[in-house]
């Protein structure tokens, strides 16, 4: 089993640019409490600890991992932006905002849809400080993800024993996405396209202002990671 996994790793390394053969092998398995529903078995194959350090809370569930994946992929779009906070529910962002401080970003993200935020997965692109932790602590959330937490903030967030606190590490994402369908797999390159102001084409007689262009690009990043047919409304770098 070990040598087979090793051989597959070597093959995939040298065949990186080839689409002729798909080989998947992973010898790191995490058994989950159950799958999407309690009557389904669930497993995760991958090195979770290479991406996150779990600082607190219960074991992650199958559905938690889906939301954590969606949240992480979304926040990759905002790593170079100012303090940004997103709230995920069922793999979609129900609130997201970029502000001058992470506290403001959280408050504005929550204001986008405070009802759906209940029981969601929260993610920040910067450190969670004490002030922000105090606000988050009043909300029931399944998971909170951040690159770091200050000591006081972490102690506050640990007051809820089941709340999952993850410290994120730099992500080296897969270049392709794979999905099981019928008796095979669908494989495609991940969408890494980045829209800029120069790539926008005005479809009306009214020219957008510089602030409106920023909001358009902001909303477009969210739309890219929203499931199904999508309309994202944004104003002032905040989803509404």
Language model features with spans:
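Active-site loops and adjacent core secondary-structure elements that bind or stabilize anionic groups
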Residues: 1-149, 153-191, 212-230
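Active-site/ligand-binding-proximal alpha/beta "capping" segment
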Residues: 195-210
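Conserved structured catalytic cores and adjacent interaction surfaces
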Residues: 229-240
């Amino acid at each position: 089993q070990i040598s087979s996994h090793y051989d597959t790793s070597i093959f995939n390394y040298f065949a990186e640019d080839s689409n002729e053969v798909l080989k998947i092998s992973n010898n790191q398995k995490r058994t989950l409490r159950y799958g999407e529903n309690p009557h389904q078995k669930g497993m995760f194959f991958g090195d979770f600890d290479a991406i996150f350090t779990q600082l607190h809370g219960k074991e992650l569930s199958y559905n938690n991992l889906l939301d954590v994946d969606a949240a992480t992929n979304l926040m990759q779009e905002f790593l170079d932006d100012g303090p940004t906070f997103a709230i995920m529910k069922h793999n979609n962002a129900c609130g997201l905002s970029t502000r001058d401080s992470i506290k403001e970003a959280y408050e504005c993200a929550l204001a986008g849809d405070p009802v759906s935020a209940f029981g969601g997965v929260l993610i920040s692109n910067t450190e969670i400080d004490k002030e922000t932790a105090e606000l988050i602590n009043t909300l029931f959330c399944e998971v909170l993800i951040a690159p770091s937490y200050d000591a006081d903030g972490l102690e506050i967030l640990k007051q809820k024993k089941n709340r999952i606190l993850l410290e994120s590490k730099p992500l080296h994402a897969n270049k392709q996405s794979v999905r099981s369908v019928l008796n095979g797999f669908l494989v495609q390159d991940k969408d890494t396209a980045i829209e800029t102001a120069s790539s926008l084409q005005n479809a009306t007689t009214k020219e957008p202002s510089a602030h409106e262009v920023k909001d358009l690009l902001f909303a477009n990043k969210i739309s890219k990671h929203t499931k199904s047919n999508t309309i994202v409304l944004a104003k002032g770098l905040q989803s509404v």
